[in-house]
Amino acid sequence: MTSYSEYTEYADYTVGEPIEDELAPSGPVSERWDTRRFQAKLVNPANRRKHTIIVVGTGLAGGAAGATLAEQGYHVVQFCYQDSPRRAHSIAAQGGINAAKNYRNDGDSIHRLFYDTVKGGDFRARESNVHRLAQISVEIIDQCVAQGVPFAREYGGLLDTRSFGGVQVSRTFYARGQTGQQLLLGAYQALSRQIAAGNVEMHARTEMLDLIVVDGRARGIVARDLVTGKISTYFADAVVLASGGYGNVFYLSTNAMNSNATAIWRAHRRGAYFANPCFTQIHPTCIPRSGDHQSKLTLMSESLRNDGRIWVPKAKGDTRPAAEIPEDERDYYLERIYPSFGNLVPRDIASRAAKNVCDEGRGVGPGGQGVYLDFADAIARMGRKAVEEKYGNLFDMYERITAENPYEVPMRIYPAIHYTMGGLWVDYDLQTTVPGLFAIGEANFSDHGANRLGASALMQGLADGYFVLPSTINDYLARHPHKEEVDAGHPAAVEAVRETEDRLARLLAVDGDRTPDSFHREIGELVWEFCGMARTDEGLRKALDRIPQIREEFWRRIKVPGTGEEFNQSLEKANRVVDYLELAELMCLDALHRAESCGGHFREESQTPDGEAARRDEEFTYAAAWEFTDTGAAPVLHKEQLTFEYVHPTQRSYA
């Protein structure tokens, strides 16, 4: 087998025609969203009930979209693999949601949020999309307050805000450390109302396994009932994927165990381009791994960096308890290196800094894989009660997991995989390269570039679901009325079902000696080592040599007990690992081809003398949109050139 080490620069992929966002309007960036909404064709309210829209996922993006589309009059068929829509992983989001309300009159504005997001993403996001997100952020808070979301309030009753990384204003609205939960319950109650009204047909415990494409357009999905194992087809005039990101390819992440990439990857195999798969986010404040037994990591909200101070001992190998290390022997390294932003630098920078001090031998805790997040100064300044009111549930969660009281001893934290900025390529209308297939929330790549700012995931999910998609999908439905009825007997549907059943039967037939989880752990550890916080040409080539070998071994040795006609979690897991084994290869290939450092993608060969990420704008100012050809075959790279009219690329500085 030819190894990647022997390939020439372009032998492992081909470069196709450039891709353009043809729907992006021109004119001043502040007017483009209004321009696009005016240009879009509409569907008469009386005709909307004649249209069916499939929505896959019930998190913030999917729940908001399903509720809003049904409220508009469309018939919505919605799917989630959980036993209830409110079990979506959005419920785990902690710290807050950004919005340019400027309640504190501290200099915030829509333009500043736009600027901070483009800069925070290291100039690898579209200006048009980011400005739209900043505009809509203001409306999101009004929507959520109207739903009764219990945002924190100041003494006088006004909504309270706090700061997150990469900004110098206070724009993050929050509900203690449970913001995702409260926002999701708001979307869930709106969705439940439409379910009760008969406008949304909900299918829980049902997983999408393939996309049905008819005459080049998305017309339905193949799904499996996870309780009975029954394979069914569902048809619609448009399909919306709101299935989240692909962080669980790393095995250990802060994502829920069942979060997976199957929906977006199967859509990719059917023609939807996958953009910037190497742009993955590593969160700097997570509880460190405690041993090989773990299958999940736990996030500690970025909001803690408002009042907690991050430090390590100045001396290498200092194993004294934190309380015994004097102040003058502590290195508050973020405050030292980045005095303007201190502990609130963007996530990619904070994560690399933590890795660097641990690599120097100054880490704390077991194996030296941790740094301190210390609240002693905050407690002395504000009092324990005030700290408890702001962070009490997070402190309680930390103590339950670690048996350490963070009011008395510093938290120990270390970076972990948390979010994926890459995803399905979408145009300004959030439509993929498969007409009629839309991707929203973390399932797409559109708004965050190479690094997402904290508290912007909830903002994007609700912006896409409540405001953007319900406006843009009308245009598609109005311009593409489907005259042909599609049912289970259509050749495209029959073929999609056959391929799905064959894949499941093949998994069951191998009868090997290794569990799906063992393969998931192996591929995850490989990707973390070579495509994690720091990446090198040599390491990525090693990964690309090894992944096909793991994939080949998987199909020889996988063991899936039981049958496909029953509740079978081993089969569920194996089916998802199949996708991870393909997606991991594309992630590493994308990271290898992008021979620059930007945001969360850090190539050790491309850094400044100070160790910061060094972009190569003359070569890589584009979104990399990958076209699937076949498993193990060379994909096709399509480049979408990025232009910057309002926020000109510079070397990011947070010093």
For each predicted feature, which ranges?
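An anion/pyrophosphate-binding glycine-rich loop and adjacent beta-alpha core
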Residues: R266, Y273-R400, S471-N474
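Conserved N-terminal glycine-rich FAD pyrophosphate-binding loop of Rossmann-like flavoproteins
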Residues: D83-Y115, Q281-T285, D292-K296
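Short hydrophobic core segments
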Residues: I54-V56, Y234-S243
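Conserved redox-cofactor binding core of oxidoreductases
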Residues: I140, V145-K230, F235, C286-L297
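Glycine-rich loop(s) and the adjacent beta-strand/alpha-helix scaffold that form part
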Residues: A238-H293, L297, H448-S471
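Extreme N-terminal leader/targeting segments of oxidoreductases
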Residues: M1-I53
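N-terminal Rossmann-fold NAD(P) dinucleotide-binding loop
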Residues: G62
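Glycine- and aromatic-enriched mobile tails/lids
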Residues: A40-T52, A65-T68, Q72-Y74, Q78, ...
